[in-house]
From Swiss-Prot:
NCBIfam families linked to this entry: OM_YaeT
Protein name: Outer membrane protein assembly factor BamA
PANTHER family given in the database record: OUTER MEMBRANE PROTEIN ASSEMBLY FACTOR BAMA, SORTING AND ASSEMBLY MACHINERY SAMM50 PROTEIN FAMILY MEMBER
Sequence ranges assigned to domain POTRA in this UniProt record: 24-91, 92-172, 175-263, 266-344, 347-421
Pfam name, any one: Omp85
Taxon lineage: Bacteria, Pseudomonadati, Pseudomonadota, Gammaproteobacteria, Enterobacterales
């Protein structure tokens, strides 16, 4: 068969020769030049097979399909008789990719981006993708202020059609701002305008180390802030005509010139509310707090629109349209605002779904919902659902999405997406102490037991001085309305032994059970009952009480004490996140007192409040205030039982002081005086190392929580640092050292006297085994007998 026509197809810079014929039958297909791309893969990308009737269009489409694979450099097709021959030149295979010169971006980040583009080892080399990579990388460097950066890619092709890519990156220096000039400002001085900019052309006196670098994106943000400033002052026709950025000859400095037109100030003479607003007309009108002859304020009007949208979203109107149409009186410089509102459809919630809860049962999440299925959509209730879920310790990263249903009129589905946190801890400890000997402890806790939302905690301690065990369980929805039941059973056999002066063996067992009632989303009331059986045995009488009367605690020699207590508390909680809160308040007020049938008669009250105040919009810098105050006393002439005293341990401690060494001490007389604190040869008295606690307490913490330098954003969820000031003490309000002149050498624990304080830094890590807290403190107020401990480590929630 004669060759009638030869046609050439150019696609990009490739050519194809084909002898044309309208339609003919192919009996053979041959391929030349294939090395890494198989014949079968080519056949999958062409539009004909052996025996097919083909046309010129079939060949054109086949060539286009093959080029779209990105694996061929040239494709030439020759038609000879009933044979089609593909003469193909493959693109080289990428063998190796190396980088040099990159300091800002790691090799791994660059390789990841190249892989996303399709440029990786083992892939065919595509020059177009290289161009895209260079363009985008230069754009990135420009966005971070490296405007003169350069990227070059050198290619080395081997004989086996493989290619090595060597990417050389020149990261230019940051460009310093030489001068910022504002032209057209008649009503506000340059200094006032530049105070709105984050870009600066001069250093602040208080921060002489700061740099004045130019970033194009920051300039756009600054100009937007400038525009908003004028619009909020009434300059309705304020305009930024243009900006001019001129690089100086050395290209390391830049001059910025901004041309503005301020215009005249406009007042609002009136406003009108238009639209089918049904029964909401008056409520919406009340949001528009604009007075006649008030200067135009864009920020205020934007806030009004947001309030109206929020109001309607709580009534079921998901997407109301609010358009403000101004009528301008140029002569009088006045504006009439027309609020044109279309509330559109009203939606009901069809179904609430949860995504991400692999362990947690659906009912556990659903009972936290404030929005009810089948009722009108209410954005406020949906957001309260997020806050309720955030208060569960075992959940994080909670978001919500809505999906409008097209198959159900006015219906919308709500989906909460969440991430489950580790819910259980199992700890074992082994230690040795001079007095306690070998010590073993173990604990287990589960905040989401079998996905039920219930909490279970148990712990044991065993050493020469103590045998301790307790178990507690909390059912957060004991009654469907959100009533919690918390029950704890405990046993403690402890020998108080201080420097061989005395031993007290105290055996305690009992239980506590509380019911917690939900008042609203942020407040809860607890009321409960407790029973404690105390067995006290005094083995030594060589000690004095704090008022100096010898053996005044003789009743401890053999004593069985049963206490029945009424427990009550009020909790207010608006914290954003349980661990690492960023805003809000948590206040806990509790009390307990004995009831008839108890061997003791006493009361105790505790006030615990912490407030997190974000100092900037991103909530990276947070000011924390925390105060714990307590008071307790006997209801008769007796003292508060010593085992009910407040102690400086755990969250009560002042950092920098050893735990349980702050506050009243026991005072002794003994021949072995060197073992006591405060010993001097002129006195036969000394005090114990550890505190016996007191009936009054005030501990306050002031902290500035700051981001940790050089820590990536994703790690900031698990790490937090702060600078702190701790102050306070433990007191005994019945302490009176004037009763005995020999006690003058010891600190006075009268209320509000003898304050202890420290300053320092702290680091908290939310580790896989729970929160770990490290602190380093320096005491600024102390007494000579204080036991100091600069570096401290704690396990548990701190702030």
């Amino acid at each position: 068969m004669l060759i009638k026509t030869i046609f050439i197809i150019f696609l990009m810079f490739f050519s194809v020769n084909v002898f044309s014929k309208n339609v003919w039958i192919i009996e053979n297909i041959q391929f030349k030049g294939l090395k890494y791309f198989s014949k079968d893969e080519v056949l999958k990308n062409i539009f004909f097979n052996i025996g097919s009737n083909i046309s010129e269009n079939d060949i054109k489409h086949s060539i286009k399909s093959l080029f779209q694979t990105g694996k061929f450099e040239t494709i030439k097709i020759v038609h000879s008789g009933k044979t089609i021959i593909f003469e193909i030149k493959e693109r080289p295979i990428i063998s190796n990719i190396t980088f040099s010169g990159n300091k800002i971006i790691k090799d791994s980040i660059l390789k990841k981006y190249l892989t996303e583009l399709g440029i990786k080892e083992g892939n065919f080399f595509n020059p177009f993708l290289n161009t895209v990579f260079v363009k985008n990388l230069k754009e990135f460097y420009s966005n971070v202020g490296r405007y003169n950066s350069d990227i070059k890619i050198f290619k080395k092709i081997s004989s086996n059609n493989k290619i090595d890519l060597q990417i050389f990156i020149h990261e230019s220096n940051l460009v310093e701002i030489n001068h910022i000039k504002i032209i057209g400002n008649n009503h506000f001085p340059r200094d006032k305008i530049l105070s709105l900019f984050k870009l600066k052309d001069c250093k602040s006196w208080w921060n002489f180390l700061e740099k004045r670098f130019y970033y194009s994106q920051q300039l756009e943000e600054d100009l937007k802030n400038l525009s908003n400033f004028y619009l909020n002052q009434g300059y309705y026709y304020f305009n930024i005509h243009r900006k001019k950025v001129r690089f100086l000859k050395d290209k390391n400095k830049v001059n910025i010139t901004v041309y503005i037109s301020e215009g005249k100030k406009y007042k609002i003479s009136n406003f009108f509310l238009n639209g089918n607003l049904l029964q909401y007309y008056q409520s919406i009108k009340n949001f528009i707090n604009i007075h006649n002859n008030e200067f135009y304020n864009k920020e205020k009007i934007t806030l009004i629109v947001k309030k109206i949208q929020r109001f309607l979203s709580e009534k079921g109107y998901i997407d109301p349209k609010i358009i403000i149409y101004p009528q301008i009186n140029f002569k009088e410089k006045k504006i009439i605002l027309n609020f044109n509102i279309d509330i559109q459809k009203r939606y009901f919630v069809n179904k609430i779904n949860f995504r991400g809860n692999e362990l947690t049962q659906d009912i556990v999440l659903r009972r936290e919902m404030k929005q009810i299925e089948g009722e009108w959509f209410n954005l406020k209730l949906i957001e309260l659902g997020i806050k309720s879920l955030e208060k569960l310790k075992f959940l994080s990263d909670i978001t919500v999405q809505k999906e409008i249903l097209f198959n159900k009129e006015n219906g919308v589905d709500i989906t909460y997406t969440l991430k489950e946190q580790p819910t259980g801890t199992l700890n074992f400890g082994l230690g040795y102490g001079r007095d306690s000997g070998l010590s073993f402890n173990a604990s287990i806790s589960q905040d989401n037991l079998f996905g039920s939302g219930n909490s279970l905690k148990a712990s044991i301690i065993k050493n020469d001085n103590q045998k301790y065990a307790d178990i507690s369980i909390m059912h957060p929805y004991f009654i469907d309305d959100g009533t919690n039941l918390d029950t704890r059973i405990f046993y403690n056999d402890f020998k108080y032994n201080i420097n061989s002066f005395y031993n007290i063996v105290k055996t305690t067992s009992g239980f506590e059970s509380d019911l917690s009632f939900l008042i609203n989303a942020f407040n809860r009331v607890n009321i409960g009952f407790g029973y404690t059986h105390n067995g006290l045995l005094n083995k030594e009488e060589k000690f004095f009480s704090k008022n100096g009367n010898k053996s005044s605690d003789k009743f401890l020699k053999t004593s069985l004490v049963d206490d029945f207590t009424l427990n009550y508390s009020l909790t207010h909680d608006t914290l954003k996140y349980f661990y690492f809160p960023i805003s809000g308040n948590q206040t806990y007020i509790s009390g307990k007192n004995t009831i008839p049938g108890s061997d003791n008669k006493f009361y105790k009250f505790l006030f615990d409040s912490e407030q997190y105040i974000p100092l900037e919009e991103e909530k990276k810098f947070i000011f924390l205030t925390h105060i714990r105050a307590g008071i307790g006393n006997s209801l008769n002439k007796e003292k508060l039982p010593f085992y009910e005293n407040f102690h400086a341990i755990d969250s009560n401690n002042i950092r920098g002081f050893r735990a349980n060494t702050i506050g009243p001490k026991k005072i002794y007389i003994n021949s072995n005086l060197e073992e006591c604190l405060g010993y001097n040869k002129k006195s036969i008295f000394c005090e114990s190392v550890d505190s016996i606690g007191g009936n009054a307490m005030i501990i306050s913490n002031l902290e500035l929580i700051t981001p940790i330098p050089l820590i990536k954003t994703e790690y900031s969820k698990f790490l937090r640092s702060s600078f702190f000031l701790d102050a306070g003490n433990i007191w005994d309000t019945r302490w009176d050292k004037e009763q005995n002149i020999h006690f003058s050498q010891f600190p006075d624990y009268t209320i509000l006297n003898n304050i202890q304080a420290s300053i320092g830094i702290s680091l908290q890590w939310f580790s896989p085994i729970g929160p770990l807290v490290f602190s380093y403190a320096y005491p600024i107020y102390k007494n000579k007998n204080n036991q100091l401990e600069a570096f401290q480590f704690n396990f548990g929630k701190n702030w």
